[in-house]
Amino acid sequence: MPVGGRRITAAGAFIMGRNMFSPGRGTWDLDWNGWWGDEPPYHAPVFVLTHHPREQVTMKGGTTFIFVTDGIEAAMAQAREVAGERDVAIAGGAETVNQYLAAGLIDELRLHVAPVILGKGERLLHNVGDITLEPLGAPSGTRLVSHLTYRVIR
């Protein structure tokens, strides 16, 4: 899906939090390999932040989930190394995005907003420090989703 002239999944590597990969906390259910079925949409390495080690999981289509237990900076360093000249995308969830915003490691924020109220959950832009979001281009989307892109100014 093009956003700002680029595909969401065109990054050379992705980073996500544990909850974006798997439900539950604690030790892993090794039968669980993500929400996406046999062929996730990433088609690149995905670094999953976690406190619980797990062997990497290789899926169809070029997606490999690599589990990182030593923090956001370590995950970013590994992702940058494999991405080369391509972008590294933070795939979420909100707490992971907030950690990277607070650390000053996000340059551009792409939000895909669906008109669904889910109830309680993590708040985006919570405890991220003093940042300004500059809109890049006009919002796009459909009645089911709005795509918004911002430059992060520190």
Predicted regions and their residues:
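Enzymes that bind and transform nitrogen-containing heteroaromatic metabolites
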Residues: 1-154
